[in-house]
């Protein structure tokens, strides 16, 4: 029996196994990356939906000075905090920070509405614009995070 045939067969087998392992590892990483992106996309979507629902509800709220400063209760009822906690589990720190700022800006908007400021008042307009601006910055950060996953 020739040793060269056995060695060539062994080397070919080892190379075949290594190539299969490398291909499986690459496939696993790609699948994991896709799952991570889907998880992050879902968390972002749920948070934005909850935040928008809360802001829309607040814009229709009746003036009630005793509710000023109590927006955290109302925002919790719309699922914003639950969605924000979910986002905190899967997102980068910069995204979580912008989500927190967006939540605070919606709380400020709530306070402007329940304080009785008219929709054309400077306080209302400033709060509405701040909420819109922080939401836009958040969406930009979400897009950046989704591209990097």
What spans do the regions from the language model cover?
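Conserved non-transmembrane functional hotspots
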Residues: 18, 22-149
């Amino acid at each position: 029996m020739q040793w060269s045939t056995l060695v060539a067969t062994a080397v070919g087998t080892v190379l075949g196994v290594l190539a299969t392992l490398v291909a499986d590892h690459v496939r696993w990483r790609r699948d994991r990356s896709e799952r991570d992106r889907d998880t992050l996309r879902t968390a972002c979507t749920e948070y934005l939906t909850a935040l928008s629902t809360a802001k829309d509800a607040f814009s229709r709220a009746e003036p009630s000075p005793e509710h000023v400063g109590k927006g955290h209760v109302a925002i919790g009822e719309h699922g914003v905090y639950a969605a924000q906690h979910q986002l905190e589990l899967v997102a980068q720190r910069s995204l979580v920070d912008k989500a927190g700022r967006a939540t605070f800006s919606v709380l400020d908007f709530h306070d402007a509405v329940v304080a009785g400021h008219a929709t054309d008042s400077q306080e209302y307009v400033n709060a509405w614009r701040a909420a819109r601006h922080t939401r836009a910055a958040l969406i930009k950060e979400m897009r950046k995070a989704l591209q990097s996953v």
